Amino acid sequence: MATGCSVAAAQTITLRYAQAASAHKSIYSLPIALAEREGLFRREGLDFRVVIPIPGGADLMIAALHDDTADLAHVATPFLVRAALAGSDAVAIAAEFNDPIYSLVARPEIARMADLKGKVVGMADPDGSIAYSMRKLLALHGMSEKDLRLRTIGGTPARLGCLKRGECAAVPLGQPQDLLAQSEGYRLLGASNDAVPAYLYTVTAARRSWAAANQDAVVRYVRALAASFATIRDPAKRGAVVNTIVEMTGVEPALAERVLELYAGKNVLPRRGEIDLKGFAQVIAFMGETGQLKDPLPAPQRFVDLRYLQDVGIQPK
């Protein structure tokens, strides 16, 4: 296996990575954005290019792998499962975000969950893990979606806009927008991880056939991604990580620091890109509970190819 130094001297490989516009400027692109900023892809001899398909909703990322728009794609696990069961040979080759924290944030006049009855609540894809966790959170407070007027809005930035314009009484927000909103007087009603078990949120996906034919490129990518996760945890690189969050999201450095403090000690980020099969199984269980999948539920191993992680010494969790 080539080392980082010898790889850099080898032939450069172009690698196209599809990402939805809603993810591109969000915290969920941190591992990729940091790897770009720190030259980790370049060190592995990769000409790494982020591609944002137009139109480019999160549900279209697997399609980008099939129409030759991209080689790899950032995708939430439910979308990957649905695509694979519909005939795609797309599989997860590495994890990007494990167990996300989505906050249900409301306008200042909403003092408690019950105050949302009859009001417009912006929600993510109804078949996705965010909406599932919000339904569970509502249930903890004796409520259901039937008590609300739901509006599907893709991406934390767009949902925050709905909240600030007064068109939504509450919305689920990721970081750092949830912390930003709270600093501006909006109210935290609850968080996703109060209501659901830990699960595997987003992964890097590739077509199984393409990855097998381009193993060297995939291994280089996985090695760079693992280095990015190590950089995130390196105290000496804290400034670079904070600056990356600031550049991605437009928040102040102090707020970016709060995001990292929130994630410290939690299972939000993989340590090296390892795939949490138990967390993936939990996603499949969510999908079964909501009627998207029928019994017997498929095993998570059906939707992953671990060989590229194993090639760089990373085992599944």
Q: Where on the chain are the PLM-derived regions?
A:
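Secondary-structure end/capping motifs
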Residues: A212-K294
